[in-house]
């Protein structure tokens, strides 16, 4: 296969995978909380509020993530996002109290914030090279 064709396909694959993971990981908690509600004997509202800081960090973290991706490395930031999403989601699974779950969900939100500023600019810059 010609490398000129292979490169854009890899870019598309990694960009689509990153985008899918970012949105899926941010949305999983709303389903998982239904099982946690019974196991931990907390109300749905109490458990949903644990995602408040994480959801704020999805938006607020995008500003420094974009700044860092512009000055350092877009692909490096995406690698950090993939590793961070995996690590923080595993830590969420090991959480056994509300405080640790809130901290780990906040980390998940922070790593989710990386995709849009780093991933979109990465795709645009690389697509301009291959036009």
Residue ranges of model-derived segments:
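Paired small-residue
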Residues: 88, 99-107
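Cytoplasmic helix-loop-helix junction between adjacent transmembrane helices
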Residues: 104-129
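Small-residue-mediated transmembrane helix hinge/kink sites in multi-pass secondary transporters
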Residues: 34, 63-67, 120-121
